[in-house]
Amino acid sequence: MKNEDVVRLFDAYADDLYRFAVYYSGSKHDAEDIVQDVFLKLLGDHVEYKPGKEKTYLFTMAANKCRDYLRSASRKTGVDLESCENELQYFDDFNERNRAVFDELMNLDYQFRMPIYLHYYAGYSYKDIAGILKISESAVAVRINRGKALMKIGLEEYL
């Protein structure tokens, strides 16, 4: 891929990829590394994607890098809750209700959390989410519905 194309994609999507990677990894430092790896891969490899599908392709690459990173042997186990709490500062002006919704989302298992995040926070269609997570569209729909049902239980005081 040409340098100009990578710069254009970086300008258009780096912030969204960073937010996604922060959310996925739980660490802004890890997210920076993941986003850097995605764009370095674009510079180094002959990359082909369908026109108009750049964003989906980049998020698929980022999701794969995140999974690889979380699986790596050098990755420490456990989650530093204080670090996760600090990461929320990246998301602007959370009011109490938005904060409660986001906290409830963060408490969901990955299988429910990621489809909900990608659909409601990143604006992806079920079809695009299926491609990113490598599951069927019907599985995306089921996971979103089940995740929303689980969140509803935890958010009853706000309803």
Language-model segments: which ranges?
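Residue-level preference for hydrophobic side chains embedded in well-ordered alpha helices
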Residues: 9, 13, 17, 38, ...
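Acidic, proline/glycine-rich intrinsically disordered inter-domain spacer in sigma factors
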Residues: 77, 82-106
